[in-house]
From Swiss-Prot:
It comes from Macrolepiota procera (Parasol mushroom). The keyword NAD does not apply. GO terms for molecular function: cysteine-type endopeptidase inhibitor activity. This is Macrocypin-5a. It comes from the Eukaryota. The lineage of its organism: Eukaryota, Fungi, Dikarya, Basidiomycota, Agaricomycotina.
Amino acid sequence: MGFEDGFYTIRHLVEGQPPNIPGGMYASSKDGKDEPVTAEPLGPHSKIRWWIARYPEAGEDMYTITEFRVDESIPGQWARPHNEVGGPVYLYDRIRAEETGYVCEWRIQPAYEDVDGVFNIMGNSRIGSTDWADLREEGGKPQVYLKPVPVVPNMYIPRWFISKVD
């Protein structure tokens, strides 16, 4: 199941948390461009919206995640280093991403076949492990980062509840 291009909220689900329980931490761009993507405990009616768009040039289930901007400035996108393990996800525009060697495409796939709205956001893949977007405490604030998860059966993969904003 793929996404239609559009505005979405992106809420982190802690391990064992069902998606239908309200609250939680929503991915945020409040710190601005060239900073790590953080999270805030705001509800689905907040102004934290992301434009998720297909990026078929990069392959199946590949997307870009772009911040919503009300001004005329160039928006930032979720960007990840292609060779760093465990690093933060930054909010870079395409020019900055290319200068730093970061990648702005993400594989977003359903976490379960029978549960709507719950997804895994995959970054880098290498022999033995895959990096997944997750949330951690860094410098006193929640930060989106790349969590390496070994490729073995029954390992928990971080999940996100992604819902369309009308």
